[in-house]
Amino acid sequence: MAIFKILVLLLSLCCFSQAQLSPTFYDQTCQNALSTIRSSIRTAISRERRMAASLIRLHFHDCFVNGCDASVMLVATPTMESERDSLANFQSARGFEVIDQAKSAVESVCPGVVSCADIIAVAARDASEYVGGPRYDVKVGRRDSTNAFRAIADRDLPNFRASLNDLSELFLRKGLNTRDLVALSGAHTLGQAQCLTFKGRLYDNSSDIDAGFSSTRKRRCPVNGGDTTLAPLDQVTPNSFDNNYYRNLMQKKGLLESDQVLFGTGASTDSIVTEYSRNPSRFASDFSAAMIKMGDIQTLTGSDGQIRRICSAVN
């Protein structure tokens, strides 16, 4: 009964936010909003292609902490801890300045209209598309929070050593199912990880990691030191959005433990990974659907929250 009540609550929250959000939300109030954001994001990624992964991750880290409300953008104050300082974000999350630049560009044409939360969501879509990923309609109309939630960030952002059960339960609490989990994890076809996050995988086990892959990665990630050294999550096509991530998992070449647990355990995720490795169109379609679904998590709409003037501070 308790689980049923939780599912009903999640469904009601999701459906209410969906009723408030729409791809055409700004058509009458700021017709150039989405094109202005797109131009700003494309400029940023053209300067640093890795930024695409950072922007997708930023949207994920925003939505998983008390909903898609741009709380991740807020800097600390004497009375508020910042999510930027949480375990999963500190010296790791990136793209804040890109969102700030996009916000400034939008403010110059439509002051006080477009939320930072919407800019983050649109930026993630535009980033995906720019590096070869799918283009999907982003529903907009979110409003920004007036608080940050560091404790929730420490609790609800996935750990790089998370088990499949931990990940599945976390995603379920956010209203996302197993297919959503596997599809969204495919964003790790892009980006890089610090040595600290995969050192344990290289040196503490040998059962679920390809020996050659492990040997190669150890060269730049020694057992002692080098914790901040970066390595691509997908060694083959690190800057292109494709389905190679899933082929890597099938070959025991997932860089993070939380990636490799999706394949090889006999769980239901095995068949989804196999499907995506063989059918890039299905992966692209499911990734788009999961991103839209994630963007509906616990949004602020109507008169809730505010439209921040700058994304790093409440009005």
Curated annotation (Swiss-Prot):
<dbReference type="GO" id="GO:0006979">
    <property type="term" value="P:response to oxidative stress"/>
</dbReference>
<keyword id="KW-0873">Pyrrolidone carboxylic acid</keyword>
<feature type="binding site">
    <location>
        <position position="158"/>
    </location>
    <ligand>
        <name>substrate</name>
    </ligand>
</feature>
<feature type="binding site">
    <location>
        <position position="67"/>
    </location>
    <ligand>
        <name>Ca(2+) 1</name>
    </ligand>
</feature>
<feature type="disulfide bond">
    <location>
        <begin position="195"/>
        <end position="221"/>
    </location>
</feature>
<dbReference type="GO" id="GO:0004601">
    <property type="term" value="F:peroxidase activity"/>
</dbReference>
<keyword id="KW-0349">Heme</keyword>
<keyword id="KW-0732">Signal</keyword>
<feature type="disulfide bond">
    <location>
        <begin position="116"/>
        <end position="311"/>
    </location>
</feature>
<dbReference type="GO" id="GO:0046872">
    <property type="term" value="F:metal ion binding"/>
</dbReference>
<dbReference type="GO" id="GO:0071456">
    <property type="term" value="P:cellular response to hypoxia"/>
</dbReference>
<feature type="binding site">
    <location>
        <position position="71"/>
    </location>
    <ligand>
        <name>Ca(2+) 1</name>
    </ligand>
</feature>
<feature type="modified residue" description="Pyrrolidone carboxylic acid">
    <location>
        <position position="20"/>
    </location>
</feature>
<dbReference type="Pfam" id="PF00141">
    <property type="entry name" value="peroxidase"/>
</dbReference>
<feature type="site" description="Transition state stabilizer">
    <location>
        <position position="57"/>
    </location>
</feature>
<feature type="binding site">
    <location>
        <position position="65"/>
    </location>
    <ligand>
        <name>Ca(2+) 1</name>
    </ligand>
</feature>
<feature type="disulfide bond">
    <location>
        <begin position="30"/>
        <end position="110"/>
    </location>
</feature>
<keyword id="KW-1015">Disulfide bond</keyword>
<keyword id="KW-0575">Peroxidase</keyword>
<dbReference type="GO" id="GO:0005576">
    <property type="term" value="C:extracellular region"/>
</dbReference>
<dbReference type="InterPro" id="IPR000823">
    <property type="entry name" value="Peroxidase_pln"/>
</dbReference>
<feature type="glycosylation site" description="N-linked (GlcNAc...) asparagine">
    <location>
        <position position="205"/>
    </location>
</feature>
<dbReference type="InterPro" id="IPR002016">
    <property type="entry name" value="Haem_peroxidase"/>
</dbReference>
<feature type="signal peptide">
    <location>
        <begin position="1"/>
        <end position="19"/>
    </location>
</feature>
<dbReference type="InterPro" id="IPR019794">
    <property type="entry name" value="Peroxidases_AS"/>
</dbReference>
<dbReference type="GO" id="GO:0020037">
    <property type="term" value="F:heme binding"/>
</dbReference>
<feature type="binding site">
    <location>
        <position position="242"/>
    </location>
    <ligand>
        <name>Ca(2+) 2</name>
    </ligand>
</feature>
<keyword id="KW-0964">Secreted</keyword>
<feature type="binding site" description="axial binding residue">
    <location>
        <position position="188"/>
    </location>
    <ligand>
        <name>heme b</name>
    </ligand>
</feature>
<keyword id="KW-0408">Iron</keyword>
<keyword id="KW-0325">Glycoprotein</keyword>
<keyword id="KW-0560">Oxidoreductase</keyword>
<feature type="binding site">
    <location>
        <position position="62"/>
    </location>
    <ligand>
        <name>Ca(2+) 1</name>
    </ligand>
</feature>
<dbReference type="GO" id="GO:0042744">
    <property type="term" value="P:hydrogen peroxide catabolic process"/>
</dbReference>
<keyword id="KW-0376">Hydrogen peroxide</keyword>
<keyword id="KW-0106">Calcium</keyword>
<dbReference type="GO" id="GO:0140825">
    <property type="term" value="F:lactoperoxidase activity"/>
</dbReference>
<dbReference type="InterPro" id="IPR010255">
    <property type="entry name" value="Haem_peroxidase_sf"/>
</dbReference>
<protein>
    <recommendedName>
        <fullName>Peroxidase 4</fullName>
        <ecNumber>1.11.1.7</ecNumber>
    </recommendedName>
</protein>
<feature type="binding site">
    <location>
        <position position="189"/>
    </location>
    <ligand>
        <name>Ca(2+) 2</name>
    </ligand>
</feature>
<dbReference type="InterPro" id="IPR019793">
    <property type="entry name" value="Peroxidases_heam-ligand_BS"/>
</dbReference>
<dbReference type="InterPro" id="IPR033905">
    <property type="entry name" value="Secretory_peroxidase"/>
</dbReference>
